[in-house]
Amino acid sequence: MKGGSVVETWDALQKDVEMYLAKRPGKTAVSCWLLTEKQGFSIGGKNELPSASLIKLLVLVELCEEVRRGRANLKEAISILGPAITGGDGIIKELKIGHTFTLEELATLMIIVSDNEAANQLIDRLGMKAINERAKKLGLAQTHLGRLMMADASGEKERDNWTSADDTVHLLRVICETAKTGSPLGRWMISLLARQQQEGGLRRNLPDFVQVAHKCGNLAGVEHDAGIFFGKRPYLLAVLTTEQPASYVGRETIGMVSLLCARAFGLLG
């Protein structure tokens, strides 16, 4: 694929990815976008899927928009009063009730360790309606926040959290475009994603020198990872897997799709 046109690269890469996915269990949606060439490909990219923690990207973008408009301040403090502390990923649940965090700290925890309580505190502060309105304004047709993290949706679609591979890549584009304008908020969002501590997906088969800023998400049978890849040909990649027999199987799929893209775009040297 080296030395070919962008179209030839896309066609060959998409074929390689499709051939690989045909052999894998479960279902996988992929969306990839080259930032410089402004071209990409999508495999099932508009399929509406359980978002898992990828929905936290939308919460982060809405927080930064509220800060930009002067309706929120990253230094604003919120006390975790309990007694119901959200389970699942995170460290806030391990701390004493009454601990105080700034919005900046909550966002940091929400992204780098996927803290569910931090996400819920931010959702309460911003408002679920406002977050969903942000999704609509951004043109995210398959993305919806219907519940707090770890809350029971009771099988009702409108009470669950959804997204798609294409919507996730679009959100990452918004973050990159915000940073490109010189906005400190844009650079901050990328710095949070670059400090991601949950690995095993996009970075699984890549050497340490490859720079990736990303966000993972997982539920029973669901493994997602989406990120920004830096290099001479920077690109965005979202790989969403569902109906997985085990978590590691989904992560293996994500890792191989990521490796195929990294090879195609010359990230491996």
Q: What residue spans do the PLM features occupy?
A:
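Structured C-terminal helix/loop/strand segments within mature extracytoplasmic catalytic/sensor domains
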Residues: 5-24, 36, 40, 125, ...
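Mid-domain, small-residue-enriched loop/turn segments at the edges of structured enzyme/sensor domains
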Residues: 24-27, 120-177
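Short, conserved catalytic-motif segment at the N-terminal edge
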Residues: 25-48
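Active-site SXXK
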Residues: 38, 50-78, 110, 237
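A short glycine/serine-rich beta->alpha loop
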Residues: 42-50, 92, 96, 157-158
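Flexible glycine/proline-enriched surface loops and loop-helix/loop-strand junctions
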Residues: 43-44, 102-105, 113-118, 148-156, ...
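Short, glycine/proline-biased beta-turn/loop segments that scaffold the active-site neighborhood
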Residues: 69-95
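Conserved catalytic neighborhood of penicillin-recognizing serine enzymes
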Residues: 85-120, 161
